[in-house]
């Protein structure tokens, strides 16, 4: 298996074979994200991808049960190529149960509902959509490249195709001020409308080399404190009414790991936040937070 540059995956894909289909992110304009800044986006040649599958078959002995398609936006590939990759994977790994990928909202919207359903039928079982926020104001500010309406359409299109929809939201993305509350309430509203199966809340980290980091250094962006980040998380939980949704905030960026099913576990998780805010439960120290 061959890889170009640093490889990222969701925490839940730690057991997966990571197959790099694209290099970098086709959007790569988000002001907060430093993951792919060192990569010029391109799609790997199909010949190399299929060779990697055969190499992985030999390495794993055909016994792999999960595969994750890297980098940030494999769904942008041509439909026929994606189907070929999926078919080769399920042929190479007879025990394969699911193939997953990140799904950029703009790239997702280039696929019709029928095309996404076809990908699901060929074994694309899960998509991770970086929603980050439901606020148009914040989406524009961080150069996400889509409107809230387009983000909602991308998520609904994936879910309605039968693909298991996992979304990521970013606590603290709006910084301090009036936009903070709008960010959280609009995000909760989008979750209620999008109806994902899983929501992963991550906490903003200012990454050197990103425009948001530069804005912070120049005094144009004021980040929230750890306590304010937890207050945002609590507000989010209190305003998600659709269920059942599996909710986690166990990513290394978070100050307090949480896990539960909404809305059944809302009270338990908000109580855990209150305990941390009162100083009764320790929060993850800054030096232990990571991407």
Predicted regions located by residue number:
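Conserved, mostly hydrophobic/aromatic
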Residues: 25, 33, 49, 69, ...
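Catalytic cores of alpha/beta
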Residues: 114-116, 175-193
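Canonical Radical SAM [4Fe-4S] cluster-binding loop centered on the CxxxCxxC motif
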Residues: 5-51
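Non-cysteine beta-strand/loop elements that form the S-adenosyl-L-methionine
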Residues: 22, 116-134, 163, 169, ...
């Amino acid at each position: 298996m061959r890889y170009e540059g640093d490889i990222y995956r969701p925490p839940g894909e730690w057991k997966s074979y990571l197959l790099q289909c694209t290099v970098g992110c086709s959007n790569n304009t988000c002001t907060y994200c430093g993951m792919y800044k060192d990569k010029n986006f391109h799609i790997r040649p199909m010949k190399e991808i299929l060779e990697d599958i055969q190499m992985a078959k030999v390495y794993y002995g055909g016994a792999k049960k999960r595969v994750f398609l890297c980098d940030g936006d494999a769904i942008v590939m041509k439909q026929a190529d994606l189907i070929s990759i999926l078919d080769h994977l399920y042929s190479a790994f007879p025990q394969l149960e699911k193939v997953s990928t990140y799904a950029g909202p703009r790239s997702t919207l280039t696929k019709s509902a029928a095309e996404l359903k076809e990908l699901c039928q060929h074994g694309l079982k899960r998509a991770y959509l970086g929603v980050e926020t439901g606020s148009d104001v914040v989406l524009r500010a961080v150069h996400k490249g889509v409107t809230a309406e387009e983000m909602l359409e991308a998520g609904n299109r994936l879910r309605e195709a039968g693909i298991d929809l996992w979304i990521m939201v970013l606590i603290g993305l709006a910084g301090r001020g009036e936009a903070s509350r709008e960010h959280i309430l609009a995000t909760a509203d989008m979750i209620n409308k999008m109806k994902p199966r899983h929501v992963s809340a991550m906490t903003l980290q200012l990454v050197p080399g990103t425009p948001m980091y530069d804005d912070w250094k120049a005094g144009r962006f004021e980040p929230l404190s750890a306590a304010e980040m937890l207050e945002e998380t609590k507000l989010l939980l209190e305003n998600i009414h659709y269920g059942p949704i599996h909710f986690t905030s166990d990513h290394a960026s978070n100050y307090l790991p949480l896990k539960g099913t909404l809305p059944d576990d809302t009270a338990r998780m908000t109580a855990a936040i209150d305990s941390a805010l009162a100083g009764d439960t320790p929060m993850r120290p800054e030096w232990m937070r990571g991407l």
